[in-house]
Structures are given as structure tokens and as C-alpha cells.
Amino acid sequence: MSHSQTSHNPRLQAALAHARHGRAVLPVYWSIGGRCACGRADCPSPAKHPIPDLAPRGVKHATTSRVVIRAWWAHAPLANPALATGEASGVVVLDVDGDHAGFTSLRELEHIHGDIPHTQKVRTGSGQHLYFAYPGTHLKNTAGKLGPGLTPRQ
């Protein structure tokens, strides 16, 4: 893939934007016709797991290196950029499931605790990610404890 082709790739541009902000990324598989591009018919995490040929150690291979990121997307231009959360990038992500449960839980939290602070929001294939500053300490596993359809990622 030529430089001009990669420079117009929105997935590459998203990965580079994260890197510019000090957030380490890695390439993960994408979806083809509703199935994971990894080719496994029974893939347990479609379009959400690292590409082993590019990042064999998964999130431990996440980087902010523009050279590495460009090489990854030259090899796999359809790859989705995944963010290494927690201390590696200084962010915690709240994964809001796109079904009614996730957004209902989010509204209930806002009703109890007030509006969620202004933050970066990214639409995902099945909902939304909200980005918050990493608090400096590892949070205990809170999956499902904030409400149905809400999962913090760090």
C-alpha cells in the first residue's frame, strides 16, 4: 500500500491520533460480513482481538511509535485500532453496550450522581466508549457493578 493510500486510511489516522496524544495502540481484527476477519467461525471475540502476526504479545505490543503503527496498517489496512488502557496510555474507558441496557444504566448513574463530565466519546460497532483520565491506581474488576451493559476497561 502506497504512502498516499495509507495517509487516507481513517483507521490508520485514528491510530496515529491516539499515538499523538500519548495513547498506545495496537491493530485488532475487523469484521467481514458480520464475522471476524481472523477466519475462525467460532471466534469468541469477533473484530476485537489482536492480530498475532503483527502484535504477538497482544496489548504488550501496543505502541505510540508512528513508524510501527504505519507499518502495521500498511500490512493490515482494515485493522481496527485498539487502545491499551490503564497506565500504558493514561486512560480508562467506559464501554457502554449499544443495547438499551447500557444507555439505560448510564442515564441511571447520571440521575444518581449527576451528569458525566465532558469527555471524549467514540462510537463503536456495538455502542460507545467514554474516555476518562487514568486515576493512577488499578481499579478492581467492576464489570457489571456499575449497571448492566457498562464495563470499565483499564
Which stretches of residues belong to each language-model region?
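Conserved phosphate/metal-binding and DNA-contacting active-site motifs used
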Residues: 1-154
